[in-house]
Amino acid sequence: MSLLTIAQSILKETKSGSVPTSIIGNTEDVAKQILEVMTVSITELARSFNWQELQKENSFSTVIAQTGYNLPTDFDRFVNNTFFNTTTQHAVMPVTPEEWRVLNNQGITGGTGFSYSRIRAGQVILLPTPAAVEAHIYEYISNLVVLSSSLVGQSTWLADTDVPAIDAHIVRLDATWRWLKNQGRPYGEDQKIANNAAIERVRANGERRTIKHYYYDANIKIGYPQTITP
């Protein structure tokens, strides 16, 4: 479904009277209002979940004595626990600005086996200062939440033929309750349906781990029995 067909479907379902034949560039109030709703919807959905459709990888090699490395132009946020130094096979641990200052003041240098990172001014900053050329990789969520008709990523709607990068049905459900709210109409039940559908889609649309009875994770404070006796 495209921007135009989603918008028209919402307007027809909610019996909103006028159903425009175009959205982008249309000066009618209904077209401008539904475009605003669609923009808010795709933005909020993209920020609320780590959609697999928006997940990407970025890799780079350090430069000796250089601490900062530019983030991808479409970077929105890190996928947690995916930043690794693939040369040393060690994780790069994210820290808060306060923790960063403490570590920096301690004068940490290479050789400890530990490395830290933070995001600042469009760059990922590493500590300690790299003393060698080493490969790094991390996963991130892209801000290109819309695709053109030729499947080129965009950060917003630019044409009636654009399609959402994430599940179009979820976008339609989410935009429906937002449209009803915009019009001052009851929307609670539609919002509940949309939220539940989004959560279920995220669960179903990505890989999930099978829980095994012998699995152990020190961070999880429960035990798994090795055998089960009926």
Task: Indicate where each model-derived feature is located.
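Glycine-enriched, solvent-exposed interface loops adjoining structured elements
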Residues: 1-230
